[in-house]
Amino acid sequence: LPQFAGLPKEAAYGTVDIGGDFDYIERAFDDFKYGSWSKRPFLDCVIPTTVDPTMAPPGKHFMSVFVQYVPYKLAEGPWSQETKAQYTKDVLDTIEMHAPGFKNLVLHVQTRTPWDIENEVGMTEGNIFHGELTLDQLLFNRPFPGMGQYRGPFDNFYMCGSGTHPGGGVMGAPGANAAHEMLKDFKRGVVQ
């Protein structure tokens, strides 16, 4: 397992955010605004095999790294194998800065750009949140104004997932909220 500088070894058993302070995050976002990924990106690192070792061969682990602020369209042109390789290198270099020796532990890397995510699973512009997490698209405005109560545009149609409140990154909550609305409607005799 990687050893993150300044953190106890047990930190690898949870989520480790690499993002520093607000200035670090703002610089990462600025790169995104101008059509590039950040050379020092904001990262969410999770090693699920610390909780469920059956997900990898004995003695091995895998790490999932969510990179914030990666543009769908690059200012320099479309994503290519070369740009993807440089992006991957920048992410690995950033982790290495915070967990010295990390790159020596890596046996395989699989990188997904926003373009890959859109083409593989159909999420528009690779946005795993199914919409921006901005004030005009949060709370009762999620997924859009008038559809914020988990009910769809016709009877017996309910919505859940990242595109509904509270949005992406809150696992299970949108589904639980939609189920509560469905149960309320069922008790009132609305659901058939």
Map each language-model feature to its residues.
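Solvent-exposed residues in well-ordered beta-strands and their adjoining turns
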Residues: 1-2, 68-70
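Flavin-binding catalytic cores
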Residues: 19-22, 30-39, 58, 81-122
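Amphipathic alpha-helix from the class-I
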Residues: 70-78
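C-terminal structured subdomain/cap of oxidoreductase catalytic cores
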Residues: 1-6, 60, 83-91, 128-192
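A glycine-rich dinucleotide-binding beta-alpha-beta segment and adjacent secondary-structure elements
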Residues: 38-46, 97, 101-165
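Mid-domain catalytic core of redox enzymes
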Residues: 1-56
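Short, histidine-centered active-site or binding-site loop motifs used for metal coordination
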Residues: 69-71, 163-164
